[in-house]
């Protein structure tokens, strides 16, 4: 079940590979995510010391969050992947033009997971071409639907 999608990632990048990673969360964060108070649009993934971290994801704390915990909505969260996956991704990210972006948050067997994508940035003309393709598909569907009624 999807919790939050990053539609901006699909508009700004060509997604070449996808990986599922666990996230190290605090208790108040899990409660807030279950309540749907999460946004990953501004998030990105970095590699530090052979570990991966999700930066810029915003999890708004609930009003009922404990007073003895100081919630930080945009703290850096560690991503959990297998060592061989991390090594493979480090090699790819070091190549020119590749980056890691969070694509969505979802549940797998009751646990919150983050799908990350190995992505290459789109140029402005690529974005325009994608938009034209989407408009043409929509127009084609409209024409076919009109033909079916006649």
From Swiss-Prot:
The keyword RNA-binding applies. Pfam families: SmpB (PF01668). One of its GO terms (molecular function) is RNA binding. Residues 127-150 are annotated as: Disordered. InterPro entries: SmpB (IPR023620), SsrA-bd_prot (IPR000037), SsrA-bd_prot_CS (IPR020081). Keywords: Cytoplasm, RNA-binding. One of its GO terms (biological process) is trans-translation. It is found in: Cytoplasm. GO terms for cellular component: cytosol. Gene3D superfamilies: 2.40.280.10. Required for rescue of stalled ribosomes mediated by trans-translation. Binds to transfer-messenger RNA (tmRNA), required for stable association of tmRNA with ribosomes. tmRNA and SmpB together mimic tRNA shape, replacing the anticodon stem-loop with SmpB. tmRNA is encoded by the ssrA gene; the 2 termini fold to resemble tRNA(Ala) and it encodes a 'tag peptide', a short internal open reading frame. During trans-translation Ala-aminoacylated tmRNA acts like a tRNA, entering the A-site of stalled ribosomes, displacing the stalled mRNA. Belongs to the SmpB family. This is SsrA-binding protein.
């Amino acid at each position: 079940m999807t919790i939050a999608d990053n539609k901006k990632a699909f508009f700004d990048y060509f997604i070449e590979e996808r990986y599922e990673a666990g996230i190290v969360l605090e208790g108040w964060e899990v409660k807030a995510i279950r309540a749907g108070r999460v946004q990953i649009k501004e998030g990105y993934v970095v590699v530090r010391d052979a570990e991966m971290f999700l930066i810029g994801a915003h999890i708004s704390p609930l009003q009922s969050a404990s007073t003895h915990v100081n919630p930080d909505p945009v703290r850096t969260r560690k991503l959990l992947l297998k060592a061989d996956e991390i090594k493979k991704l480090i090699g790819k990210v070091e190549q020119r033009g590749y980056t890691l972006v969070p694509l969505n948050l979802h549940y797998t067997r009751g646990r919150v997971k983050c799908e990350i994508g190995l992505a290459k940035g789109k140029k402005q003309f690529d974005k325009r071409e994608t938009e034209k393709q989407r408009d043409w598909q929509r127009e084609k569907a409209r024409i076919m639907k009109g033909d079916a009624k006649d």
